[in-house]
């Protein structure tokens, strides 16, 4: 009973859009990216919104992404997710997210992960 109450409180504290975003993130991005420690495959996306592009010291970024520079804003993340190769030619990122609602859900979720 106590565990169920704790679970209900946790679910109530999580906005529905964040839960949806987390599910979309896990489906579209979670195969390579985490919101915890960096994997060998891809950099962590914890705190990505507002972070300088290609700035984590524990990940070896592609020359294309390093050359892009800038900051990961909501608009930049949307453009990158739409077509990574067009946004940063030479990037190793190969997965795009063509659906605008999915991209928005992912970005909204990433804004909550600090």
Q: Where do the PLM segments sit?
A:
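Short Fe-S-cluster ligation motifs
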Residues: 57-78
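Short glycine/threonine-rich turn/loop motifs
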Residues: 39-63
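Sequence/structural segment immediately N-terminal to covalent heme-attachment motifs in c-type
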Residues: 18-40, 45
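Sec-exported extracytoplasmic/periplasmic mature domains
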Residues: 26, 30, 34, 50, ...
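Positively charged n-region of N-terminal signal peptides that target proteins for export
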Residues: 1-4
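N-terminal signal peptide c-region/cleavage motif recognized by signal peptidases
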Residues: 11-16
């Amino acid at each position: 009973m106590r565990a169920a109450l704790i679970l209900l409180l946790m679910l109530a504290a999580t906005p529905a859009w964040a839960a949806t975003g987390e599910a979309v993130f896990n489906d579209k991005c979670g195969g390579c990216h985490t919101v915890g420690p960096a994997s060998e495959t891809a950099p962590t996306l914890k705190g990505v919104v507002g972070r300088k592009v290609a700035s984590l010291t524990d990940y070896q970024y592609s020359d294309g992404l390093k050359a892009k520079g800038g900051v990961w804003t909501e608009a930049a993340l949307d453009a990158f997710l739409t077509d990574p190769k067009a946004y940063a030619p030479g990037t190793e990122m190969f997965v795009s997210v063509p659906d605008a609602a999915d991209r928005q859900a992912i970005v909204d979720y990433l804004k909550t992960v600090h």
